[in-house]
Amino acid sequence: MLHIAICDDDAWMASKVEALAKIFFRTHCVDIKVQSYQSSENLMYDLQDGVYYDLLLLDIEMPGIDGMGLAKNIHDNMPAARIIFITSHLEYAITAYEFSVFRYIPKTALDDKLPVALEDFYKLYGLERSEYYVIKVKLILC
């Protein structure tokens, strides 16, 4: 089961992101558990209490702790978790990659870009958890 967090102070946008994520993963027969937060502080408290998410869909501009502050904390404490920023503020795009952000999606392109980002995330997630590894070796004959 995938654990997904959505954090956006705009309840309508958080609901839309959640609906798109549920549709995507349902069509791929993937069980997910989604937790939505309208307060970045509440998400931060849960993270400090040890709650783990595989994927976090974050807004950047929020009251209190902004998305960049959340991303830094997540990057430092849950390096395997993936972050997708969904924002109206494109000016933070370069800085966002300092925290290994997986994708940066403008809210105006959400319907087109989020399913593609989720597809790419799911492929990577599957590869990272695969039970099979390819080991390249060089054959040396003596």
Question: Where in the sequence are the language-model features?
Answer:
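Active-site residues of response regulator receiver
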Residues: D8, L58-D59
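Two-component/phosphorelay signaling modules centered on CheY-like receiver
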Residues: D10-Q35
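Acidic, metal-coordinating helix/loop segments flanking the phosphotransfer/catalytic sites
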Residues: S36-L55
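Acidic catalytic/metal-coordinating carboxylates
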Residues: S39, D66-G69
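The feature encodes the CheY-like receiver
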Residues: P63
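Short amphipathic alpha-helix used as the core "switch/output" element in two-component signaling
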Residues: M68-P79
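Conserved binding/recognition cores within well-folded domains
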Residues: V116-C142
